[in-house]
C-alpha cells in the first residue's frame, strides 16, 4: 500500500479514537473545574468531589445500583453457566435454535421488554417491585452469559473431560476440576457483561423499580433535567477510574479482551507458551 493510503488509515484511526475517548477525558477534566457550568477559564478545584461525598445523593444511588447489579450478575452467572453446560448435551439442531431464541432479549428494544414485563407483573399482582426489577434485568442480561459461555464450550478440548471420567472422577468432580476452569474466561466475560448492562440499564430500572427506589441511572436522569450538575462529572470520573482499574486487574491476572470475549485459548495458557 502507498504511504498516502497508510496516512489516511492512521488519520481515520486517530479520529475514531478521539471520538471515543475525548468526551471521557473532557468529563474527567470538567470534574476538576471550579468555573460554573464547566466553562472557561479553567479553575482547578476538588470541591465537586467534596460535594459528592458530603451532600450529594449520588453515592447512595451508585451503591444501590452496584449491589443490585452484582446480585443480578451472580444469578445470571449461575443460571447462564448451567444452561450453557446443559446445551452441550442437546442435539446441534436444537442447540442452534435455543441460541437463536436467547438472542431475542438482546435484539428486542428494552422499552418493549420493560413495558411487557410491567404489564405481566401488574396482571399477576407484583407490580413495580424489587422482584419485578430483578427478574426484568435478569431476562436481559442472561443471554450474554449463555452465549459467551456456550461459545467457550464450543471451543474447548473435551479430551481432558473424557480422561477424567475414565480415571473414575464423578460428574461433579469433572465439572469443577476440568470443565469450569476451561470455560472460566467465558464465565468471566459473561459476568462482566451482565454487570455492565444491568448497571447502565436505565429503561428497565425506570419502568420496573418501585416508586421510592432510585438507582443511579434513574437518579442521574432525574437530576440532569434540572440542568448542569458538577458532582455528576466527579462521579463519572470515579466510574471511569474503576473501569480502568478493572481492565488493569484482568491484564495482571493474564486475561485480555481477546481471551475473555474470543479466541481459543485463555490468558493463563498464553502466558505459559
Where are these regions (language model features)?
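Short hydrophobic faces within alpha-helices
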Residues: 62, 87, 104, 159-167, ...
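Transmembrane alpha-helices
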Residues: 12, 17-24, 104, 114, ...
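Transmembrane-helix boundary motif in ABC transporter permease subunits
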Residues: 1-6, 70-102, 119, 175, ...
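Membrane-interfacial helix termini and adjacent extracytoplasmic/periplasmic loops
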Residues: 37, 46, 94, 111-140, ...
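N-terminal, non-cleaved signal-anchor transmembrane helix
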Residues: 1-56, 60-63, 67, 254-273
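C-terminal transmembrane helix and the adjacent membrane-cytosol boundary/short C-terminal tail
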Residues: 2-11, 94, 150-161, 165, ...
